[in-house]
Amino acid sequence: MRKSLFWALVCLFALSQVGLASSSKHIVHYQIKAKLLPDEKAVAGEEILTWLNDSDRFISELQFHLYLNAFKNNRSTFMKESKGVHRRFKLDKKNWGYIDVKKIQIKDGPDLTTTLEYIHPDDGNKDDQTVMRVSLPEPVPPQEKITLHIEFYSKLPKVFARSGFYKDFFMVGQWFPKIGVLWNGEWNCHQYHLNTEFFADYGVYEVEIAVPGEYVVGATGKRVKEVRNEDGTITYTHYQEDVHDFAWTACPDFMEFREKFTLENPPVDTEIIMLVHRSHLNQKERYLSSLKNGIEFYSQNYGPYPYPTITLVDPAPGAPGAGGMEYPTLFTSMTFWWLPKGLFMQEMVTIHEFGHNYWYGMVGSNEFEEAWLDEGINTYSEIKAMAKYYGEDSSMLNTHGLKISDFVLQRARVMGIGKMDPILKNSWEFYSIGSYGTNTYSKAGLMLLTLERYLGEKVMSKIMRTYFEQWKFKHPTSKDFIIVAEEVSGQDLSWFLTSFCTALINWIMLLAKSDPRK
């Protein structure tokens, strides 16, 4: 395909997303060429980044996340906090990961590589290299753009914490130099911590991925081009607007399944892409059914899913650390070949991770500082979705007469260690990873269910839909959520939300009995 024809097709694709583009201000535009090096367990990359200074200040330096450097050695902040363990999965000390920025320069301008330095805004750990800063020869004026050319090499760790490899399976997330968020004229670019996830600005991603011919590839966005190269590799090009990240996966043992999914009310038209490892083919229909349920529930309750694709990735056996993670238009789920039908763990993970495309993907919450705005709201949504499709009292387990709901499990979790921290706190400052998870997921989700029972389901439904519509493709704070809740309900809710979010409260549950005389 000639280059001019290819970009004409890309333009047509972009026009087809005009409904999306009208909602998002494109702060970043990434053009990335990536080559998978299976023997080296690495990715060689070249990046053209155009960044908009969407502030009223002159900006004289740029800050970037280098997330993979969390796995560079045992002195990084992530490794010090985790001791090499994440969600019970352990680091292989023979297979570290890192990102090497070989060159960074202004396109057709000065080389900035010599100005590169690592900074440590959160904890002062001089051995941490997950945030870099470069100085500019001239500041970027307000509402002006700068374009950079970056060359990098990303060595992937053996996967135990989201990104990495296991044999010939690759989950490639947080893999390129990613510019931080300029928020209120200041850089918001935190280090990578054990408890933190990610935060970035919206824009456009055009990414070319070259892999050996036997590999099956899935990635953020829609595939717009596929070229078979003379050396036996295949280059896949993906394009997506109105996203704040780009992730991809590759494995020769993936079986790819595609199916169109549509809804009339609200109107949804997307393509489901499932990459199922051949050892889990017996679980394919469970993946498909639960993903359809997720798309339907979130679309009907919050707003129609707007992207042309959604990709479900089933990680290889031996790579559970890659499972249960969200990226824009792509997520990883998890299962086991022996998973019984009455245990809905696979369904819960699939619906939960898809749901992040709303509360992390389209509503761009700052997961470093206010993780509950994603994790808690999504847990609330997950509980309601699971109850709808799998039973109010059996949404997690329904077998041999034993029934357990998602709600009951979340409540039990809070009764364990939920009292250690308030919900609203910098993610790396929680007492422990257990307290972080319990408070930002379970306690926050139950807080919203309690609010629903206080206000009524109809009012709460309007709050959630209004919040999603007002803050889609933007960066809200907890204050913004409270404002929406108060405007929709017509009530002062500061007493309720601030007590849950910022205070430590132990709720004592007393046995309540109905009075037959009333």
Whereabouts are the PLM-identified features?
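Amphipathic alpha-helical substructures
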Residues: H280, G437-K518
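Acidic/His/Gly-enriched intrinsically disordered linker/tail segments
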Residues: E375, T379-L446, T450, Y454
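A surface-exposed beta-strand-loop module
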Residues: L52, R87-D168
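Zinc-dependent metallopeptidase catalytic helix centered on the HExxH motif
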Residues: K292, T332-L402, M464
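Short, hydrophobic/aromatic-enriched beta-strand segments in well-ordered soluble domains
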Residues: E47-L49, F64-L68, L136, E144-K158, ...
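Hydrophobic helix-coil surface modules that form long, contiguous segments used
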Residues: I179-W187, L194-I351, Y380, E392
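Glycine/proline-rich low-complexity spacer/linker segments in large multi-domain proteins
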Residues: S76-R87, D92, Y153-Y205, K260-T262
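N-terminal, polar/Ser/Thr-rich
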Residues: F13, G19-A44, D56, Y166, ...
